[in-house]
Swiss-Prot record:
Protein name: Putative pumilio homolog 7, chloroplastic
Organism from which the protein derives: Arabidopsis thaliana
Gene: APUM7
Top-level division of the source organism's lineage: Eukaryota
Chief subcellular location: plastid
Transit peptide location on this chain: 1-77
Keyword Ribonucleoprotein: no
Lineage: Eukaryota, Viridiplantae, Streptophyta, Embryophyta, Tracheophyta
């Protein structure tokens, strides 16, 4: 920009004409062969404001910058060679006297040409760019699907190999389409690129005949027909040039003109979406939209509904063309690939679509190919969704066969349940099993690993699903194990939650055993970060025998428990739900020699507030009588809650 500003200032001086790149001898210090064609127009054809926008203008006559003598010469072609490196220091500036010898410059140009407007012959190309060509013929239809271009999908010139997400150009998944057996597109590469080769020859780079040396595009003049498939990797590729068909072209790019003949595609030309990397979501019309990244499991959603929501219209010579999803291919085409498809992000969705829309024969083909890989697919990031779907739609005999394979080896079902993906399938298995044989096999497989399952982040959900879906009798093995390992389970992060579920779903003797075991260990559990929840749960049940046993365990320890973070919650729960515990708790609190320490304790102050709210009559008065002498502590961060409320006036 600085060079152009300096050039502009020079052009305003009549004594120093503007030096264009062609006037600088330093520009041609390298071994270059120059062959350029330019069109020249008089400066008088342009206004002062447009002289630099349309070309380079340099008047020498200050009185009339627009006047110029007529041009009567022809530009000679010269070859300039030099061993010195190319220098651009004098691109626009050169001494006028040294540059002009006998009225000519280094290139042999007459001085009168300095006042001419020099510009490239781009007007015809601009007209060519501005002209919009409509599609002469629609894309051919096949027996399988309408293969009409969608304006939302761009057939870009880039090649996307499997390492780039499993896509080739055009947005189609790599490997999804096999090259058609008979296909041809009689299309001139020149019309693909939108440029005339004869014009392109006129625009060679000034430094040589290599059009790409300084970034100019190259266009081939080959008129040979092209195929929409190039070794199964490129769709509508222009083999002779850099430009390809784009469903949407910006205003500055030429539109496409093409014809198609003898193009046919059958269902046998379809390959499944597998054996490719699947990090990049599909953008072709063959994929089904999902609302979230986790929605790999298609729960009974018909593909007809999705197809109706993805219609699109585009103008083709004024005729609307409908674009829709292709129909499902014949299962014979994907037979032998189902196992690999099940482990693919898009393949598992495709197979789920077959379950929704296909026949029982199609489901049988899928089942027969995955039954030998049940364990692996259950723990696969994508295969687990297919297994969940299969458990929903399969027959009882098929479900029994799945259970037999999953429980064939000892500890195998436990290992699946501990897996982040496998736990989903095992939970779905528990939901769908009906026969006694299926339930018995699952129970026998889970029983040895009960303690590991109940403590695991993933495995504990399998136990909870058993409690929800199986009968009380079938869950007896869970209740017995929970009673046996009650303390160990109650003091675990995940186990304490499952233990509460066990109490909620158990009946009669099993429930009594669990509650009795918690009550006997209430003092220990009350001080545990997780065990205190089990004690609070039993207190809220208000079972007299359990409460009596628990209060006997806690008697004499209320002051100590009130000053601890976790057990203080349990003491508050006793004051709220166990009226028989209130006198004992209040007596122990007021008998403390240094009661002011309880008032200022970060946890005990909550117990005192709960005692003031829960007690009445003489019991409440005895507590207030101990609190009033310490009113000086009302500004204490913990005590002010006691004195600021109306608890003392109750």
């Amino acid at each position: 920009m600085d060079e152009f500003r300096e050039a502009s200032s020079v052009s305003s001086s009549p004594s120093t004409p503007l030096r264009t790149p062609l006037h600088s001898p330093n520009l041609f210090n390298g071994d270059f062969s120059v062959s350029n064609r330019f069109s020249f127009k008089s400066s008088s054809d342009y206004s002062l404001s447009s002289s630099f926008s349309n070309g380079l203008c340099s008047p020498e006559d200050s009185s009339s910058p627009f006047s110029s003598p007529p041009f009567n010469g022809i530009i000679p072609k010269h070859n300039h060679t030099s061993s010195s490196p190319v220098s651009f220091d004098s691109l626009f500036f050169k001494d006028h006297e040294k540059s002009h010898v006998n009225g000519t410059d280094d290139l042999g140009l007459c001085e009168d040409l300095y006042r001419m407007n020099i510009k490239e012959d781009v007007e015809e190309d601009q007209i060519r760019y501005a002209r919009t060509e409509t599609l002469k013929d629609p894309l051919p239809k096949s027996d399988h699907t309408d293969f009409t271009p969608d304006p939302l999908y761009n057939f870009s010139p880039k090649h996307y190999e499997p390492s780039n997400g499993g896509f080739v150009s055009g947005g189609f998944p790599y490997g999804f389409f096999r090259p058609p057996k008979e296909s041809s597109i009689n299309q001139s590469c020149a019309s693909w690129s939108g440029f005339d080769q004869s014009k392109n020859d006129d625009k060679r780079n000034m430094f040589g005949n290599n059009p790409q040396q300084f970034g100019w595009p190259s266009y081939s003049s080959s008129n040979s027909g092209t195929s929409p498939y190039n070794n199964g990797q490129e769709i509508f590729e222009n083999r002779g040039g850099m430009r390809e068909y784009s469903a949407y072209s910006p205003p500055h790019q030429p539109e496409v003109s093409y014809k198609h003949q003898n193009y046919r595609t059958t269902t046998s030309d379809i390959l499944p979406l597998f054996c490719q990397r699947t990090q990049v979501p599909m953008v072709s019309k063959c994929s089904e939209p999902f609302s979230s990244d986790e929605s790999f499991f298609m729960n009974g959603k018909s593909i007809d509904h999705q197809r109706s929501n993805t219609r699109a219209l585009m103008s083709n010579n004024g005729n609307p063309t409908e674009i829709c999803h292709p129909s499902l291919p014949n299962m014979c085409d994907i037979q032998g690939y189902v196992y690999l498809m099940a482990k693919d992000q898009h393949g598992c969705r495709f197979l789920q679509r077959i379950f929704d829309e296909g026949t029982s024969v199609d489901a049988m083909i899928i089942f027969n190919e995955v039954i030998a890989h049940v364990v692996e697919l259950m723990m696969d990031p994508f295969g687990n969704y297919l297994m969940q779907k299969l458990l929903d739609v399969c027959t009882e005999e098929q479900r029994t066969q799945i259970v037999l394979v999953a429980t064939e080896e000892p500890g195998q079902l436990i290992r699946i349940s501990l897996n982040a993906y496998g736990t989903r399938v095992v939970q779905r298995l528990v939901e769908t099993i009906r026969s006694g044989k299926q339930i018995s096999l699952v129970k026998l497989a889970l029983r040895p690993g009960f303690l590991d399952l109940i403590k695991d982040l993933n495995g504990n959900h399998v136990i909870q699903r058993c409690l929800q879906c199986l009968s009380t009798e079938d869950n007896k093995f869970i209740f017995d194990a929970a009673t046996k390992f009650c303390t160990e389970i109650a003091t675990h992060r995940h186990g304490c939650c499952v233990l509460q579920k066990c109490i909620a779903y158990s009946m009669r003797q099993q429930r009594e055993k669990l509650i009795a075991e918690i009550s006997r260990n209430s003092l220990l559990l009350a001080q545990d970060p997780f065990g205190n929840y089990a004690v609070q749960f039993v207190i809220e049940l208000r079972i007299p025998s359990a409460v009596a046993m628990m209060l006997a365990q806690l008697k004499g320890h209320y002051v100590q428990l009130s000053m601890q973070k976790f057990s203080s919650h349990m003491v508050e729960r006793c004051l709220m739900h166990c009226p028989e515990s209130r006198p004992q708790i209040v007596r122990e609190l007021v008998s403390v020699p240094h009661f002011d320490q309880l008032l200022q304790d970060p946890y005990a102050n909550f117990v005192i507030q709960a005692a003031l709210a829960a007690t009445k009559g003489p019991l409440h008065a005895s507590l207030v009588e101990v609190i009033r002498p310490h009113s000086i502590l009302r500004n204490n961060p913990y005590c002010k809650r006691i004195f600021s409320r109306n608890l003392l006036k109750k």
